[in-house]
């Protein structure tokens, strides 16, 4: 049991014992209650001024029992108080009290459920961008360690994030978003269901270890599902097989397909000498308007221009990198292949 809880229990027991003894002595010895209370306190603390002593046999017997039991309890109480102060428990108590007061005033904040490796990355990003959040984890040591790094920006609650009372402590009814990064997919599904029930409007982003869990988390109420293993695996495959400046884009487009069922593709198109687009500016070519595809960048020999300006002039040999739906990219392919009209 924590020192603070033991301190409260022993303190309540001591006060109850003092008041009860005072009441009994006032009746047995026939004195007023204040005098009896005064005698009760100086007796249990072994002060013993001697200005008042029980006169009856019953009063003296009760005092002997009171001394045997009460002195031990009070001495234990004093030792707990000393431990509470010396071990920094009092300082921690004050700190937690301040933290609870801060949490009570929060609104439009985020709740990170599970402060492991992934949750920690999310938290540090939020701290960097001054986004208010509360971290929830069952491991108090991990939370304390993080608090010591960011004492002014890190708020936390020790507990099981799947439980309603813990989420309510984190003010889920006033939260803007919840990040579910618990260890298992089953835990994240249960957490998502609970969070969605407590706040139907909250934005929930959940972690999925298995690909099959993505669908289940969405059914449970997650707005977005992220699979770290899927992202990491695709990224490693891309940089191994197709290393280059745009490999990461194809990775995330693949993720968009797998996780969000978005029909998006990334392709490259070469401008030929007789292409209608050759020697036209991007503004005049109006690729976006004609095809719906978005140009990410243009490679010219060894140089690469990301997000080129509208005044950029297309030349033969330029490689256009664009993304869009299959239909968008088909229109762009036809536009690139379209020949110039001969005069």
Swiss-Prot record:
Question: Where is coiled-coil annotated?
Answer: none
The compartments listed are: Cell membrane
Membrane topology type: Multi-pass membrane protein
Segments forming domain RCK C-terminal: 253-338
Query: Keyword Hydrolase on this protein?
Result: no
Q: Does the keyword RNA-binding apply?
A: no
Extracellular face of the membrane: 29-61
Short motif Selectivity filter, span: 46-51
Q: Which residues form the RCK N-terminal domain?
A: 107-227
Its transmembrane ranges are 8-28, 62-82
Topological domain spans for side Cytoplasmic: 1-7, 83-343
Could you list this entry's UniProt keywords, alphabetically sorted.
Cell membrane, Ion channel, Ion transport, Membrane, Potassium, Potassium channel, Potassium transport, Transmembrane, Transmembrane helix, Transport
Its cellular-component GO annotations read: plasma membrane
For molecular function, the Gene Ontology terms on record are: potassium channel activity
What this protein is reported to do is described as: Probable potassium channel protein.
Task: Return the protein name.
Answer: Probable potassium channel protein 2
Q: Which organism is it from?
A: Methanocaldococcus jannaschii (strain ATCC 43067 / DSM 2661 / JAL-1 / JCM 10045 / NBRC 100440)
């Amino acid at each position: 049991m924590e020192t603070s809880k033991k301190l409260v229990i022993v303190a309540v027991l001591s006060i109850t014992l003092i008041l009860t003894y005072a009441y009994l002595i006032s009746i047995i010895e026939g004195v007023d209650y204040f005098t009896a209370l005064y005698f009760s306190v100086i007796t249990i603390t072994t002060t013993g001024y001697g200005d008042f002593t029980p006169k009856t046999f019953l009063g003296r017997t009760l005092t002997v029992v009171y001394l045997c039991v009460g002195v031990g309890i009070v001495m234990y109480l004093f030792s707990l108080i000393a431990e509470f102060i010396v071990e920094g428990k009092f300082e921690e108590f004050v700190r937690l009290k301040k933290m609870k007061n801060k949490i009570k005033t929060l609104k439009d904040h985020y709740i990170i459920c599970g402060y492991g490796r992934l949750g920690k990355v999310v938290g540090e990003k939020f701290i960097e961008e001054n986004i208010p959040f509360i971290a929830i984890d069952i491991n108090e040591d991990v939370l304390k360690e993080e608090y010591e790094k960011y004492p002014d920006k890190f708020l936390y609650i020790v507990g099981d994030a799947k439980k309603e009372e813990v989420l309510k402590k984190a003010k889920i009814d006033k939260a803007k978003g919840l990040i579910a990064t618990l260890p298992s997919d089953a835990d994240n599904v249960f957490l998502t269901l609970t969070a969605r029930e407590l706040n139907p409007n909250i934005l929930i982003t959940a972690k999925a270890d298995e690909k099959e869990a993505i669908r289940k988390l969405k059914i449970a109420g997650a707005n977005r599902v992220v699979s770290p293993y899927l992202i990491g695996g695709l990224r490693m495959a891309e940089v191994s097989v197709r290393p280059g400046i745009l490999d990461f884009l194809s990775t995330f487009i693949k993720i968009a397909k797998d996780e969000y069922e978005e029909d998006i593709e990334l392709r490259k198109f070469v401008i030929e000498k007789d292409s209608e687009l050759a020697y036209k500016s991007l503004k005049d070519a109006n690729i976006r308007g004609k095809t719906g595809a978005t140009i990410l960048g243009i490679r010219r020999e060894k140089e690469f221009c990301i997000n080129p300006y509208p005044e950029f002039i297309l030349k033969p040999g330029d490689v256009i990198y664009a993304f869009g739906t299959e239909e968008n990219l088909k229109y762009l392919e036809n536009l690139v292949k379209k020949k110039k009209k001969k005069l």
